Amino acid sequence: MASSNPPPQPAIGDQLVPGAPGPSSEAEDDPGEAFEFDDSDDEEDTSAALGVPSLAPERDTDPPLIHLDSIPVTDPDPAAAPPGTGVPAWVSNGDAADAAFSGARHSSWKRKSSRRIDRFTFPALEEDVIYDDVPCESPDAHQPGAERNLLYEDAHRAGAPRQAEDLGWSSSEFESYSEDSGEEAKPEVEPAKHRVSFQPKMTQLMKAAKSGTKDGLEKTRMAVMRKVSFLHRKDVLGDSEEEDMGLLEVSVSDIKPPAPELGPMPEGLSPQQVVRRHILGSIVQSEGSYVESLKRILQDYRNPLMEMEPKALSARKCQVVFFRVKEILHCHSMFQIALSSRVAEWDSTEKIGDLFVASFSKSMVLDVYSDYVNNFTGAMSIIKKACLTKPAFLEFLKRRQVCSSDRVTLYGLMVKPIQRFPQFILLLQDMLKNTPRGHPDRLSLQLALTELETLAEKLNEQKRLADQVAEIQQLTKSVSDRSSLNKLLTSGQRQLLLCETLTETVYGDRGQLIKSKERRVFLLNDMLVCANINFKGQLEISSLVPLGPKYVVKWNTALPQVQVVEVGQDGGTYDKDNVLIQHSGAKKASASGQAQNKVYLGPPRLFQELQDLQKDLAVVEQITLLISTLHGTYQNLNMTVAQDWCLALQRLMRVKEEEIHSANKCRLRLLLPGKPDKSGRPTSFMVVFITPNPLSKISWVNRLHLAKIGLREENQPGWLCPDEDKKSKAPFWCPILACCIPAFSSRALSLQLGALVHSPVNCPLLGFSAVSTSLPQGYLWVGGGQEGAGGQVEIFSLNRPSPRTVKSFPLAAPVLCMEYIPELEEEAESRDESPTAADPSATVHPTICLGLQDGSILLYGSVDTGTQCLASCRSPGLQPVLCLRHSPFYLLAGLQDGTLAAYPRTSGGVLWDLESPPVCLTVGPGPVRTLLSLEDAVWASCGPRVTVLEATTLQPQQSFEAHQDEAVSVTHMVKAGSGVWMAFSSGTSIRLFHTETLEHLQEINIATRTTFLLPGQKHLCVTSLLICQGLLWVGTDQGVIVLLPVPRLEGIPKITGKGMVSLNGHCGPVAFLAVAISILAPDILRSDQEEAEGPRAEEEKPDGQAHQPMPDSHVGRELTRKKGILLQYRLRSTAHLPGPLLSMREPAPADGAALEHSEEDGSIYEMADDPDVWVRSRPCARDAHRKEICSVAIISGGQGYRNFGSALGSSGRLAPCGETDSTLLIWQVPLML
């Protein structure tokens, strides 16, 4: 019944009536958009025809529901609908249960979003509408007022009815997955009229996209009218951007719509157009196959199971198993109809991106796919149990598989929705690569790529969480209810970080392998659990659906007590006297005197062969000494040949060491606490696991290390979401605060931080596990100084888990900026081809450039810490150097007086030409505060304007205003994908601009995410900005650091998820945010430099001194064969040596082709023709597919250290540095494998 009072602001999940007055536009942050068809005829017959249940109180002001058949439609296919019917014969409401709904006239109902509750329900009676993405064709959209509606903003006309608006691609599309977009425009957001001034092209884009949608989807709209019996849009919720729309189930006719089909290829197409047509054909073919798979799930499995008597599977279980399959099919059926229309007119429009945006940017798609993904594990569990307990069901699945043409199982069909969006992403990436700049489809493709990536990321995260819950539940079932482990697992405070099946090995007293067995190892956030795997089930069932194992817990231990120990590790890290090594039948203590405190684990044959080579080398050296006493001169028996034997044996020893290292790459040795011995002394026992590949071992070692760091007080918790539940844990990928160190070793001077860069340098001395646990290898260069005094540079080594200072040197003036300049790819290749250079000073190496306050520009080599200044110069007019950037052509310096100085490369391309006068360009009247180097352009900021320069000629192309306030300056610019995020000298907002159109796309208010940490703090300013690994780091002048997720791919890097705030920050402004990245390969035990220099150094040894290996520091693997070896290192023939040939045979013909050294059984000497194989040994099968490992750390610099977690209840604690000391905080990110 109607109420005289205005309705209150609706809460999330409340039911809304379509006609109820919504909140005013001033109070809304994201009102979204309501697509409606204008209709005024026959509305009163709608609810009676549909039989809609009334789930909300009736109101007199509610408009009746709209029946699409009431709209006059000219059907191109009159035979599709029988005459005399108000509803087409091929439209129905699905299940028979719908007949129970009748008599409702004015109604609307809502279902709460499945993401708002921990557990979703399976509605038995409520049927849901599927598709609401049909654009409205309201004539109001073409009025002049519509031009004021911006792409990512909500600037509504005062008093305009929301139902009549049509924004084309509106905020509801682009913010559909945002979880806190309502906070972006609340405080300190300028009026829309100011924003329009720097968006001249975006409104044109919106109109063009709208026009394209109207022209390209007209047939789609008509088809939707014919095929959808109900389309309902709700009013927008007040402060929520989530569209909790109802879903009414709609059955689609069996009559197939026309399949999308490309016409014949026109003549005169460019190569890119031809490729785009082929990619479109792949999209059409892939989508058709996917829709057919969804139909097979319903027609071949769900419908027969529902109709089967007696039932092999109950109706309730069928609903659970096939939950949301029909809705997904309806979504893609609509998309296929729209795709068919777009394909038919492809040669005239060549646009496809806007279709993906319109079809998959709605929260409805995320809802149905989220429900499906969350339900997938439970559905497979029901199928598995039914196969084990109901033979009729198992026989049904086998029969259906045999009858299918491709023999795909039900599991193979049901896993396709999980794989669908990654397939879309790959196709759109290919399409974007072949779409030139300026093409009308390019921006829409970038937006579509962003939407699909965001959707896929959310689904992946939900799938990961669902699998994590399933694994913990499966593990909990194997534990007794009364055990302490059960209480820990069921407390809800445990987070599964890593879970994998490893092979546990047991060795004998002499190191021989006795037995091995697979174990399931669980790494939780505070404990490590090992369980036996017990598979029970028929083999024929596992071919139809994956069978989950049952676990029997073998042992569990607290994480801080677990230690990773490498074979041959020094005894200083643990007490070998109390270590128990698992042997067959019993555990025996390893005496400290046995085997020189070294334990040989694994196949001992490699160690034995290495020892044999050592003994043989000693014998050959004695022979060499005897040969030196010969009085005669012989061609094949002299000191040259003898030294060649020695060098060859040394090389073979290195090959054997490589094999030992390779075996150790997959061997994970864990030292665990054991029961005390009889005297009460604590003991430990060693467990050895074999990982599936080297990457797996690296992942385990890294996650174990970071999980221990995560248990420290400062990381409990380390990150908070402003509105998250206190019981929830931060995502497993969150950076972990690893250490807090003083920025300068000398505290006598009050030095202020200026800049920081990371110089990646691989350390060949680090072991396999040390690389997995250490920070990104290389050196940190930290620069700063004191106002009016000198500057200082501090160099830290990161080749250990905690940084340490290795060098510090003073400068004449404070350091304001730094830039790391890597070597060009062609330079690196030329250096690899010619490793020796005539002039060592001309050797190409990465460099580090420093800009000082007195106008000096200094260039240093970054290979070592010798800190030799390679070149230096003074800026024009001795202006302070505020920023430095490099491009392939120039070293760019932004100066205080608004000048951009460009230094070209030298003629040899090794260094920058700092001696000649630079190319100078005046950017503006104010200082050039930041520079950004793109592929084909350079962006320079001066005040609120940004100037775009051509990369090679530095000619200004265009400029634009990034901020409407002339007193505000652009201070930071960072690029991600096809966008650039900017921060300003004042204000709490950051803005996103497109790299190609220069249009303003999004604005985020940082203050809304920090108010709960700094209550009452109104004046907040962004002081630093960084994008790395899909995360946007924002530093503020209050010492707070905010983390926002952004897309990683080539799309638009708009922020769509919730931000997180670090509880660890600084006492003052965050001076800078920098990233340290090093790329490692699985074969990281020896660097290329060490391998390349090794043979040269040995060849230069005059005495042929034997290399002293350390065979007892590694574990090897068995050789598959043992053959004779030709001891030949450098000599291919001794014919050139003086003296006769010592042989009882006749000399061979002197044709120059025969070798005096014949191979005894030397198949191993295939390596003789390839020197690199000598060094690198033969490739290991497990290393055939090598991947890069990316180690990442984030460094922030500022005054002091503050833990905001303790500050919430008190004034905060400051440790370990003082408030005024310059401090570095280093966050470590899990290895990107």
UniProtKB/Swiss-Prot annotation:
GO cellular component terms given for this protein: cytosol
Phosphotyrosine modification, residue list: Y131, Y152
GO molecular function, one term: guanyl-nucleotide exchange factor activity
PROSITE patterns: DH_2
Entry-linked SMART domains: RhoGEF
Subcellular location: Cytoplasm
Keywords, comma-separated and alphabetical: Cytoplasm, Guanine-nucleotide releasing factor, Phosphoprotein
Domain DH: 275-462
Biological process, per Gene Ontology: actin cytoskeleton organization; positive regulation of stress fiber assembly; SREBP signaling pathway
Composition-biased stretches (Pro residues): 1-10
Location of the region described as Disordered in the Swiss-Prot/TrEMBL record: 1-93, 159-193, 1089-1117, 1140-1161
Pfam families on file: PH_19, RhoGEF, WD40_2
Superkingdom classification of source: Eukaryota
Sequence positions bearing Phosphoserine: S40, S240
Ranges of compositional bias, category Low complexity: 72-89
Biased composition (Basic and acidic residues): 183-193, 1089-1104
Start-end of Acidic residues biased regions: 26-46
Transmembrane segments: none
Keyword Nucleus: no
Keyword Cytoplasm applies: yes
Function (record text): Acts as a guanine nucleotide exchange factor (GEF) for RHOA, RHOB and RHOC.
Subunit annotation: Interacts with RHOA, RHOB and RHOC.
Name by which UniProt lists this protein: Rho guanine nucleotide exchange factor 10-like protein
Organism annotation: Pongo abelii (Sumatran orangutan)
Primary gene name: ARHGEF10L
